[in-house]
Design a protein with these regions (language model features):
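An alpha-helical support segment within catalytic cores of ATP-dependent transferases
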Residues: 1-35, 152-159
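Active-site acidic catalytic loop and adjacent metal/ATP-binding pocket
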Residues: 19-66
Length: 161
């Protein structure tokens, strides 16, 4: 019961912070994006990179297809972002206001992943594939991660030099 109350409280708080981030970003261009663009969905061959796992293609902000390539501490992520945007800008203009969306999108992904499992929990394959999902430890760690995201959402967006 306490985990449900904690989860409900933190997700409600996060929705407010996510809304704030989208307000700060303002109007942004909606383009066709991969939707789940991360290093594991890039297949490298002798002919160069190929994007795979296209079942999540949607319309959204360009930054959605960039932020999953960022890792490490804030300084590392800023350097990586600078490199990504340098390459990206050779093909398409990037609206830097979208930087306000990075942590909001990360938070939504965390919440949506959990919701995706919960919605499918009645499928017998899901309890077998995700046995940890019904354990208190998972929910305690997930709530802690969401609280950490709440703190990150209070920080200014990543900057590039």
């Amino acid at each position: 019961d306490h985990l449900f109350v904690s989860y409900e409280a933190i997700t409600s708080h996060l929705i407010d912070r996510i809304t704030d981030a989208f307000i700060q970003a303002g109007e942004f261009r909606q383009i066709r994006i991969h939707g789940d663009c991360h290093p594991g969905n890039v297949l490298w061959t002798d002919n160069g990179p190929h994007f795979v796992d296209l079942d999540d293609c949607v319309t959204g902000p360009a930054v959605q297809d960039l932020w999953l390539f960022l890792s490490g501490d804030r300084e590392s992520r800023s350097r990586q972002l600078q490199d990504l945007l340098e390459g990206y800008s050779q093909f398409y203009n990037f609206d830097y206001r979208e930087l306000y969306l990075i942590e909001a999108l990360r938070t939504l992904r965390m919440i949506n992943y959990t919701a995706w499992i919960a919605r499918r929990w009645i499928d017998p394959a899901f309890p077998r594939a995700f046995p940890w999902f019904s354990e208190n430890k998972y929910w305690e760690e997930h709530i802690l991660a969401l609280k950490e995201q709440a703190a990150i959402l209070e920080e200014p967006p990543l900057e590039i030099a």
